[in-house]
């Protein structure tokens, strides 16, 4: 039975989500831009733009946590007779006859209609220009002539942009302009009732400082049935210092005029929009699945891949939840983002890996965050997150498996704290150093020291913070801290196995054997000190007491170590892995996924850190953290339980929640970081959508483990793990210049196991399809049984 549509619907053919009401539970946003010029836009045209770095190159202003929400933005004011309105319903809030917002791939179209006048604005950033376009279409659908005034509005920020020129231009004769917010709004007014719009007359104000804006007034006459179009261009031009001025005190606008010339006509704008849409069609073409399941198709083919691109661009920097002023790109975050992005634009993934490695210090520690503009580590947060170095190995291995590009290991990548070290340091050196760093920092049980935290930033076992305002992530004595992480031990085993594969290919057999031994040693340590009888312990605190154990009064079991234990291959042979997953279902399962821990913490404990400062059921304290749910999904497929893997995927999948939007609140087309758990007073509410590690890991879980097509060093592995009722599916996968058309059939209604595989009609043993000449089209038939 189709889902009830509360606020909109998926248009899969157009690759859009169509919002039919402006009053969504929270602003439902989209992103415009693919690389350098980026922006956020909501379904009511709220949002902001920046160049590369939301902190250091913010271009337009946005206010967080204001009432009403989602101000300011990219506004169009329409004055038609006695009515003033916005196509996006805000900020004037005049009730419209019709409203639609179409969020697409790098494009948002906001359309409103009132009294026979229809105004539609298409917002996008061209693929090859550092500018955003507002392409406005005005149509008179009435039987009368119309004389209207149209006002544009954007509010500039310009922080840290001393040598930049930002311009807001149009291709239409204007009736006036304003660049002063005070002049535009007037005294005691807000965005919903600006003086200039109320009086239908721009003041031609010039802002010399304080609150600069960009606004144009355009007068327009329309006959019945007539449509007119105009295009606003908001661009970023950065002049070299020596070319800043054309003459004393006059900015050199040569590059600005060159940019504007590319958008003079509707034909030029249309060509740029078509080029952008073609870019996205090509970007998503590397993996397409046909299956009798709408949630799989829309997430795997469109929205999850798109979210991975957005998350790769921004890490966790700028969203409706992240202000963009305090965080750059995360080391752990960005390495994980690569896992879901590498097949889309592998050359950008390569550059990102080298950039990340170059923020590592010579002792193996990694800056937890770095600024994309400077490519330097962010000292505000610093180092000391024990899992960070290992993610570099995971992302590098994924890149090589996808591309076969072994030259990346020889790429120069210096240490941030040793200037000039890039001359004699390679990426492979960083991978070895990452392994050594974890091995060198072990505690009394032989497990890796947790330092400030591991993947769970809020599990601060060496912090002991009792001072208001003190950061859990940067305070505490990590040098003398003795707390250990079982999860990092499991991640080490996983990373060590990846290193073994890489080194065996490089014919560095002695070192490969050594890493295999270290992986096995750590596996034994986890089984000895990290097993609690039914599940894996989470950690040991500063006093060497277990965290995530039956002996604890709260927080007896954590989700992270259950998933990673299986992914690392620990306890599979003796049933411990299966027991860990069964325990997860028994103690952590919720209707929206699995909660992070149980029982939830109900009081603050300084020896456990920030996790106990959250109310029960929220964030790291027993919410459904969707990110780590994906690890359990993958773990279930490794043990052959496709029904459970799919059940858990459905519970966290946003596409399944549109009919619950008044509870879920976040967008139904992108994954959220967290959903409030059953211990909270408001279970089922999502937070922190878009920019989350859930994006990449959910795509990996669905496409590589449930559908089962994943890159290996020597080809494509076809190893689905699906619910028994699935009869089969078709996948088109582009891999190293070859197109693989894969048909999977499940005649015996099993969950896992390849009974027979035909490659170009010929039987092939195993489940790995080998490499073919670039340009080839390969037909693969897989029979499960």
Language-model regions: role of each:
Residues 223, 246-249, 262-266, 270, ...:
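Hydrophobic alpha-helical scaffolding
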Residues 329-334, 338-349, 353-451, 485-493, ...:
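Aromatic-rich carbohydrate-recognition surfaces in CAZymes
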Residues 106, 158, 427, 471, ...:
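Hydrophobic, small-residue-rich alpha-helical packing segments that form membrane-like cores
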Residues 319-328, 368-387, 416-422, 447-481, ...:
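Carbohydrate-binding/catalytic loop surfaces
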Residues 1-333, 347, 352-355, 398-402, ...:
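Anionic coordination/interaction segments
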Residues 128-131, 137-149, 153, 223-229, ...:
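Beta-rich accessory regions
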Residues 151-153, 367-369, 491-611, 650, ...:
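Catalytic cores of carbohydrate-active enzymes
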Residues 246-264, 271, 299, 345-358, ...:
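Extended, well-ordered alpha-helical scaffold segments
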């Amino acid at each position: 039975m189709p889902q009830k549509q509360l606020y909109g619907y998926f248009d899969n053919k157009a690759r859009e989500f169509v919002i039919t009401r402006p009053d969504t539970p929270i602003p439902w946003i989209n992103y415009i831009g693919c690389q350098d010029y980026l922006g956020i836009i909501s379904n009511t045209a709220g949002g902001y733009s920046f160049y590369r770095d939301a902190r250091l190159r913010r271009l337009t202003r946005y206010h967080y946590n204001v009432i009403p929400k989602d101000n300011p933005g990219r506004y169009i004011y329409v004055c038609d007779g006695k009515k003033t309105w916005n196509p996006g319903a805000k900020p004037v809030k005049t009730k419209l006859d019709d409203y639609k917002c179409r969020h697409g791939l790098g494009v948002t179209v906001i359309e409103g209609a009132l009294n026979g006048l229809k105004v539609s604005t298409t917002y996008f950033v061209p693929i090859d220009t550092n500018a955003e376009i507002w392409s406005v279409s005005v149509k008179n659908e009435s039987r009368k002539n119309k004389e209207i005034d149209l006002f544009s509005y954007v509010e500039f920020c310009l922080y840290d942009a001393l040598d930049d020129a930002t311009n807001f231009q149009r291709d239409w004769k204007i009736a006036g302009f304003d660049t002063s917010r005070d002049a535009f709004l007037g005294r005691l007014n807000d965005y919903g009732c600006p003086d200039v719009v109320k009086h239908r007359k721009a003041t031609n104000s010039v802002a010399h400082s304080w609150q600069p804006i960009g606004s144009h007034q355009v007068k327009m006459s329309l006959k019945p049935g007539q449509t007119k179009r105009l295009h606003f261009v908001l661009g970023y031009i950065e002049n070299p210092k020596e070319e800043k001025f054309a003459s004393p005190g006059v900015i050199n606008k040569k590059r600005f005029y060159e940019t504007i010339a590319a958008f003079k006509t509707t034909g030029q704008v249309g060509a740029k929009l078509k080029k952008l849409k073609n870019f996205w069609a090509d970007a998503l073409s590397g993996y397409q699945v046909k299956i009798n399941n709408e949630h799989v198709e829309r997430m795997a083919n469109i929205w999850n891949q798109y979210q991975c691109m957005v998350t790769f661009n921004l890490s966790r920097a700028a969203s409706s939840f992240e202000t963009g002023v305090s965080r750059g790109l995360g080391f752990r975050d960005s390495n994980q983002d690569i896992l879901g992005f590498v097949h889309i634009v592998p050359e950008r993934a390569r550059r990102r890996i080298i950039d990340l490695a170059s923020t590592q210090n010579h002792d193996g520690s990694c800056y937890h965050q770095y600024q994309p503009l400077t490519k330097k580590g962010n000292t505000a947060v610093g180092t000391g997150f024990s899992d960070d170095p290992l993610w570099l190995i995971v992302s590098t291995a994924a890149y090589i498996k996808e591309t076969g590009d072994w030259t990346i290991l020889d790429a120069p990548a210096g240490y941030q704290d040793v200037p000039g070290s890039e001359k004699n340091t390679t990426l492979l050196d960083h991978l070895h150093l990452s392994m050594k760093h974890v091995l060198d920092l072990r505690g009394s049980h032989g497990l890796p020291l947790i330092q400030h935290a591991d993947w769970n930033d809020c599990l601060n076992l060496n912090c002991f913070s009792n001072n208001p305002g003190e950061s859990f992530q940067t305070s505490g004595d990590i040098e003398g801290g003795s707390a250990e992480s079982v999860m990092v031990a499991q991640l080490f085993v996983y990373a060590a196995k990846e290193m073994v594969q890489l080194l065996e290919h490089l014919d560095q057999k002695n070192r490969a054997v050594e890493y295999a031994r270290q992986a096995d040693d750590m596996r034994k340590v986890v089984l000895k000190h990290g097993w609690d009888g039914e599940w894996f312990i989470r950690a040991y605190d500063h006093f060497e007491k277990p965290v995530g154990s039956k002996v604890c009064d709260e927080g007896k079991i954590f989700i992270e170590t259950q998933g990673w234990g299986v992914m690392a291959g620990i306890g599979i042979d003796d049933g411990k892995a299966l027991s860990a997953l069964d325990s997860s279902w028994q103690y952590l399962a919720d209707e929206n996924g699995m909660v992070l821990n149980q029982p939830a913490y109900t009081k603050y404990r300084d020896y456990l850190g920030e996790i106990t400062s959250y109310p029960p059921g929220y964030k790291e304290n027993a919410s459904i953290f969707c990110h780590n749910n994906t690890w359990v999904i993958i773990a279930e497929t490794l043990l052959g339980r496709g029904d459970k893997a799919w059940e858990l995927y459905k519970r966290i999948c946003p596409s399944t929640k549109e009919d619950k939007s008044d509870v879920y609140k976040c967008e139904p087309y992108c994954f959220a970081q967290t959903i409030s758990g059953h211990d909270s007073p408001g279970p089922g509410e999502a937070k922190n959508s878009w920019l989350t590690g859930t994006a990449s890991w959910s795509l990996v879980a669905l496409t590589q483990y449930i559908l089962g097509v994943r890159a290996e060093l020597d080809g494509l592995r076809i190893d689905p793990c699906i619910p028994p009722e699935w009869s089969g599916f078709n996948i088109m996968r582009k891999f190293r210049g070859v197109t693989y058309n894969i048909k999977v059939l499940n005649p015996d209604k099993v969950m896992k196991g390849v009974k027979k595989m035909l490659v170009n009609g010929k039987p092939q043993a195993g489940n790995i399809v080998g490499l073919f000449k670039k340009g080839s089209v390969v037909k693969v038939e897989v029979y499960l049984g």
